[in-house]
Amino acid sequence: MPAVKKRKKAEPVTLNNKSNGKGFFSKNMFIVLAFVIPFVLMTAAFGVMKVSPFGDNQILVTDLWHQYYPFLADMQEKLKHGESLFWSWTQGGGVNYFALMSYYLMSPLNFLTVFLPSEWLREFLMFSVVIKVACASMFMAIFLRSLFKKNDFSLVIFGCSFGFCAFFMGYYWNTIWLDTVCITPLVALGTVKLFTEGKFRLYIVSLALSLLTNYYIGLFACIFVLLSFIAYNIVKWDGIKKFATNILRTGIYSLIAIGLTAFFLLPAFFGLQNTNASGATFPTTFAINIGSTNDLMGVLEAIRKILSNFITFAAPAIKEADALPNIACGTLSLVLGILFFTSKKISLKEKIVDGCLIGFMIISCIIRQLDYIWHGFHFTNMIPYRFSYLISFVLVVMAFRAFMLLESSSCWDVILAALFVALVIIFGIGTQETYALVGTAVIAAVICVLLFLYTKRIVPKQVLLIVFGVIIIGESAAAGYIGVKTTTVTGTYDYPRGEENTAQVIDYMDSLESNTTEMWRAEMTSTQTLNDAALNHYNGLSMFNSMANVDMTVLWG
């Protein structure tokens, strides 16, 4: 990591300074653009696919259709009517709603639904995805500016590289994960500030928010902090005494962050003990994912396939259990990520450590024992390699570091990067679509030619910024469209179906049971989702969620 520069003393703010507003915008213009541009691009992607309010489609697919939307509709009903958030009768004959919220509903944006009509809930979900993609880009820009003391359009370029990475575009329908993923740059920034300056507030708040918004993805944030701790202390080794101090300080502040979320994590933990997932066991024999054989050749085959998934324009994995990890984050990040390893101004130790960090995460996608540990000592049910966004994050940071140090790169460094990208494209033959390979090759060629000319001092860095900006905005727009098209959309015309009739039946059952002490239960003869009771707000027996009590599941057969 670069040495932290001593900051100048801030000038006092006075009421007479009329340029304060303009000064603030001027200072933060690129941070604002890092939010606005992704917001516009992602909204446009949904608009092209005619997602409401731009048409008659909606983003509700797979678990967003069957789980997240019904649960959010149920939560909105509870918030509007002041009902208990500790228990719900709309699922499984009665469930621990606090535990269910801890996994599915703790996005801060969800609490805004109390101010919205229920008819706007689908549009709210769509715009919440847009906001989270934009926030991921903005938080990445904040991280890069704070760490590398850079404030130009490159913040927007590399912010978009993370915000439109394949993980976001493939799993945006998994709205419950997005908050923690988009907070990742803030967790990383808090970690850096803790290590380098001893400042702990951002670290505690960001890590606590990561765990609170989704404890499952928050686990990956905790593992990443551990890996960052190891990497930092190797690169910046300053003796055993300093190392012990770092361990103590990081441990204390991590416990504080976890403690702040204990009121939610403990109910979730005890709830998980009663789920079907609690009986998982550690694999005892060596086995790999992706590769066809459980040996060295299988591992090499898996590495080749994973590297091919850095290809731009490739359709992201959506839910397939045998899919490759979503790790693509733009052609520019791929090219500059290679230049990181050839830069003469980056120490060999830092190159080795960062290379090992990415290598370890790639190997974790392959070796099932590591995959099992990453996912909380469980194997995933569909949607594999859920930590893969961290690979994209590290690569984007490495690429930005290389971009800052382009002056030290030679034409031979650029040629080496071009050869490696060509190798990645070759790896993709037979695995990726032809249009994706050709598109990546063309853009990589443009980038490498420009970098070559820059090393020869033929084109200035301002030209690089302009062209790279156009490239990344184009790639981001394409990634958004490909992501929405691959995920697919559904029609709004019959979801939920028969609302008025269902409401009338529920009112009728309430009137029949109004003078009794017993609580009625009901179920649909023809279901639309796997959580119709939550969707329509009646006392139901069926349920489908990861926090379901296994005994109740067995009871209902």
Spell out what each predicted region is.
Residues 45-148, 152-185, 209, 213, ...:
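Active-site lumenal/periplasmic loops and adjacent helix-entry segments of GT-C-fold
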Residues 62, 66-79, 83, 108, ...:
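Periplasmic/ER-lumenal interhelical loops and adjacent helix-loop junctions
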Residues 238-248, 339-369:
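Membrane-interface helix-loop-helix junctions at transmembrane boundaries of multi-pass membrane enzymes
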Residues 136-144, 183-195, 223-231, 334-341, ...:
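Transmembrane alpha-helical segments
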Residues 1-49, 249, 449, 454, ...:
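Start-transfer (signal-anchor) and selected internal transmembrane alpha helices
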Residues 115, 434, 461-557:
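Soluble catalytic regions of membrane-associated enzymes that act on cell-envelope
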Residues 197-198, 217, 352-372, 377-501:
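Contiguous transmembrane helix-bundle modules in multi-pass membrane proteins
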